[in-house]
C-alpha cells in the first residue's frame, strides 16, 4: 500500500530501516521502491547490507505440542486444509460459534495478528480460546507491537495453550494502519521470531510478498532457513 505523503513523518533522509530490520527488505516495499513508512527508497534496495548469520542454536527443542504433531502427521499423508478464522477481534463468544462451523471441515485455522494495528485480543488468549473450542489453532504474532521479552512470553503462553503453530510476521508499520498514534516496537522481525517459535516446540510459518521489490528470493530463503528444524 502506498502511503499518501501527507500522512508520513517528514524525517531526515532515510539511512536505516524504520522497522529496525537486519534481514530486510520487508514485504511492504512500495512498487516504486519507497519504504512503506517513509518517502525515501527502502535502504535494502539502495545498497547491500551484509548480514552475518549466527551459528545454529544448540538449545534442545522441546517436544511439539499435540496439535503440532497432529498437523505434521496430516502433512505427511496429504495436503493440509487450513482456513482463516473470521471472528470479531474483541468478542470471545464469537470463537466458539466460528469454531463450531469450521472444525468439521478444516484441519487448522489461522487467526492473524492484525496488520492494520487495530486492537484485538493478544495471540496467546486467542490461541487459548480457539483450542478450548476444539480448533487446531495457528496463531499470528507480529513484532511490531511487542518487544522481545513480551514476544517470548507470548510464545511460551501459546505453547501452554497447546496451539499447533505460529505465523511469524514483522508487521506493517503503524503509520500505514488504523492507529498511527501507536509507537511501533520492532525489537525483533519475522526472521528472528521464527527460530524462537521453533524453540518452543511450535510449528512456525511466515508470509512472503513476491510482488514487492526487489523481486528476489532472499526473503524466502532467509525465512525458510530460520524456520526449519536444524
Segments the model singles out, each with a brief description of its role:
Residues 110-111, 138-141, 230:
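Short catalytic-loop micro-motif centered on adjacent basic/acidic residues
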Residues 68-82, 90-108, 148, 152-230:
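Alpha/beta enzyme core
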Residues 4-5, 81, 109, 130, ...:
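Generic signal for short, ordered secondary-structure residues
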Residues 31, 86, 113-115, 142-144, ...:
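Short, ordered loop/turn segments at secondary-structure junctions
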Residues 100, 106-108, 112-115, 131-132:
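Catalytic alpha/beta active-site cores
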Residues 1-73, 78-92, 112, 117-123:
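Metallocofactor- and cofactor-centric catalytic cores in central/energy metabolism, strongly enriched
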Residues 131, 135-151, 157:
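Structural motif corresponding to the early beta-alpha repeats
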Residues 117-140, 184-206:
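Alpha-helix-loop-beta-strand connector modules within alpha/beta enzyme cores
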Amino acid at each position: 500500500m502506498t502511503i499518501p505523503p501527507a500522512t508520513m513523518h517528514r524525517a531526515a533522509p532515510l539511512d536505516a530501516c524504520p522497522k529496525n530490520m537486519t534481514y530486510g527488505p520487508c514485504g511492504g516495499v512500495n512498487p516504486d521502491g519507497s519504504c512503506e513508512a517513509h518517502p525515501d527508497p527502502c535502504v535494502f534496495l539502495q545498497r547491500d547490507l551484509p548480514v552475518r548469520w549466527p551459528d545454529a542454536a544448540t538449545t534442545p527443542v522441546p517436544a511439539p505440542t499435540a496439535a503440532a504433531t497432529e498437523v505434521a502427521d496430516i502433512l505427511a499423508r496429504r495436503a493440509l486444509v487450513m482456513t482463516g478464522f473470521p471472528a470479531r477481534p474483541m468478542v470471545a463468544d464469537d470463537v466458539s460459534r466460528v469454531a463450531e462451523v469450521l472444525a468439521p471441515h478444516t484441519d487448522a485455522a489461522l487467526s492473524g495478528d492484525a496488520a492494520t494495528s487495530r486492537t484485538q485480543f493478544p495471540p496467546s488468549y486467542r490461541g487459548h480460546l480457539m483450542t478450548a473450542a476444539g480448533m487446531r489453532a495457528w496463531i499470528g504474532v507480529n513484532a511490531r507491537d511487542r518487544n522481545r521479552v513480551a514476544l517470548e512470553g507470548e510464545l511460551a503462553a501459546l505453547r501452554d495453550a497447546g496451539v499447533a503453530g505460529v505465523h511469524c510476521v514483522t508487521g506493517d508499520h503503524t503509520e500505514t494502519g488504523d492507529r498511527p498514534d501507536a509507537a511501533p516496537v520492532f525489537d525483533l522481525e519475522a526472521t528472528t521470531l521464527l527460530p524462537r517459535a521453533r524453540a518452543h516446540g511450535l510449528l512456525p510459518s511466515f508470509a512472503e510478498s513476491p510482488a514487492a521489490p526487489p523481486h528476489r528470493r532472499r526473503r524466502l530463503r532467509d525465512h525458510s532457513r530460520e524456520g526449519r528444524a536444524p
